[in-house]
Regions:
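Divalent metal-dependent hydrolysis catalytic cores, especially in the metallo-beta-lactamase
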Residues: 7-10, 24-53, 77-84, 110, ...
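Charged catalytic cores and adjacent phosphate/nucleic-acid-binding surfaces used
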Residues: 1-7, 11, 21, 154-155, ...
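Alpha-helical scaffold elements within enzyme catalytic domains, especially in hydrolases
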Residues: 27-30, 72, 137, 173-174, ...
Length: 259
């Protein structure tokens, strides 16, 4: 199975990716993609998390550089300029303002609070439900129609509980209601299989979440690229589909449906 776009791509500005901006574009062209979208981790005013997000002071340069590259490569590939956001109610106005400065946003919730509390370090059932409602709220406000790694919370826990089912239903129903696509993240494989009470499994993609999807939900692959050559690793798709073990998923063929 092949997908001709990827809009989950990072740059060195998040401080945990490598490679020049143009190397990601050239890799996408070599992979036969028609669209490559950059979605750098959003910074929030008055707080910096250096290992996780772009600096506030780098945002203008990021946008200027990416829009220049969009123009430079327009005859070879479509380049989209965006951000990977996390939703916090007290940052709503800021996020709505930033949405006007870019082509698109995706939501990839990593923290409970805008200044920390990593869901991937540890999360309890209350945290999981908060995670789901943060995603739901971002979709409700129209900030995005793309949910990155909806199963990310499984990095910070070792059991799939009824609260996880409840959270999955919230996310899946919100995606359905607001016509959002759910991402099958191709980068979770890097963590390897983890020990869960139910047995060893990858944190994400996690099969339990995808059991909740219906034919009304659409999915896509997200390379979540932090290295240019990742965009050439098409074999990740087959591996992740084997993990999910569903052959009736509805794939989003045209990314412009949600932009």
């Amino acid at each position: 199975m092949k997908q001709n776009y990827n809009i989950h791509t990072h740059t060195t500005r998040c401080h945990h990716a490598v490679g020049r901006d143009e190397q990601y574009i050239l890799a996408a062209i070599e992979a036969g993609m028609k669209t490559i979208g950059f979605s750098e981790h959003m910074a929030y005013p008055n707080v910096e998390i250096p290992a996780e997000r772009i600096y506030n002071s780098d945002i203008d340069e990021y946008l200027d550089t990416m829009y220049a590259l969009k123009e430079k490569y327009k005859d070879q590939i479509e380049v989209l300029v965006g951000f990977e956001i996390e939703y916090y109610e007290d940052q709503k106005d800021y996020l709505l303002k930033m949405k006007e400065r870019c082509d698109y946003m995706i939501i990839g919730q990593h923290f409970r609070y805008y200044d920390g509390y990593n869901y991937d370090y540890f999360n309890n059932d209350e945290d999981v439900l908060m995670y789901a409602h943060q995603i739901e709220r971002a979709l409700e406000l129209g900030l995005t129609k793309y949910v990155a790694h909806p199963d990310y919370f499984m990095l910070g826990r070792r059991e799939w509980t009824p609260a996880c089912d409840q959270a999955a239903k919230v996310i899946v129903e919100a995606a359905k209601k607001y016509n959002a696509v759910l991402e099958i993240n191709l980068n979770g494989l890097r963590y390897g299989k983890l020990y869960y009470n139910e047995g060893m499994s990858y944190a994400y993609p996690h099969p339990e979440l995808f059991k909740h999807l219906t034919q009304e939900n659409k999915v896509c692959f997200g390379y979540d690229a932090h290295h240019p050559a990742t965009l050439l690793e098409e074999n990740r798709i087959a591996i992740c589909l084997d993990i999910i073990q569903r052959d009736d998923l509805v794939f989003l063929e045209d990314i412009h449906e949600i932009l």
